[in-house]
Each structure stands twice: as C-alpha cells, then as structure tokens.
C-alpha cells in the first residue's frame, strides 16, 4: 500500500485500454470505398473461400473488411458502410461490411437473423 508521500511523488498510472477497431477512431461506423474485392482462405483447421474487400475509409485509412452472407453485389468503387468486428479465422480482418446499406445489397431469400443482413420483413401470405 503506497503512502501519501509515494503518491505525491508519482501518481497512479491510468490503465490505457487498446481499442479492437482502431481505424474507426471511436465511431460506430464509417463510410468506405472498395478498392479491391476478392476471396481468401481461412487459417487451419477451417477451409472455405471467404469474401473480403480492401476498402479506403473516409478518414483515408485502408483496411480489409469481411462481406457477410451468401452472395454479394460489391465491386471496385462501391460505397459501403463499415462496422467493427473481427473474423476469427481470417488474420488481419477486423471489420465487417454492413449489408443493406449504401451500395451493399441485402442477402436474398433470407428468413432468419434478417436484421444482420439488411433484409426487410417478408409480406405474410
């Protein structure tokens, strides 16, 4: 236990918390332009072709973002909205594209977990 004399000489250090999505700079989302849309393979033991895009944020930074859902309409120069959230089996991918917003179309024929993929409520029959 430090004495008052100890604390006057050197005060307690504040714990600096490191953000998990530094490119967003404290914002919930950021607008970005697709530079390159491609597929990449996950690390072991998983196997797939994950759809990702290299984007330039409105702040000028370039990051890699994951495109969730089945099928997408993104191509070079598409304007998308980026949120935080890493993809566990893709190293270096710390951001997600928000579907159903700006140029990223929502997922077709989606019935469950619709809000995550920008799908409107279907009309009841």
Swiss-Prot record:
The keyword RNA-binding applies. Its main location: plastid. Residues 9-20 have a biased composition (Basic residues). Keywords: Chloroplast, Plastid, Ribonucleoprotein, Ribosomal protein, RNA-binding, rRNA-binding. InterPro entries: NA-bd_OB-fold (IPR012340), Ribosomal_uS12 (IPR006032), Ribosomal_uS12_bac (IPR005679). GO terms for molecular function: rRNA binding; structural constituent of ribosome. It is found in: Plastid, Chloroplast. Residues 1-23 are annotated as: Disordered. GO terms for cellular component: chloroplast; small ribosomal subunit. One of its GO terms (biological process) is translation. Part of the 30S ribosomal subunit. Belongs to the universal ribosomal protein uS12 family. HAMAP family: Ribosomal_uS12_B. With S4 and S5 plays an important role in translational accuracy. Located at the interface of the 30S and 50S subunits. This is Small ribosomal subunit protein uS12c. It comes from Euglena gracilis.
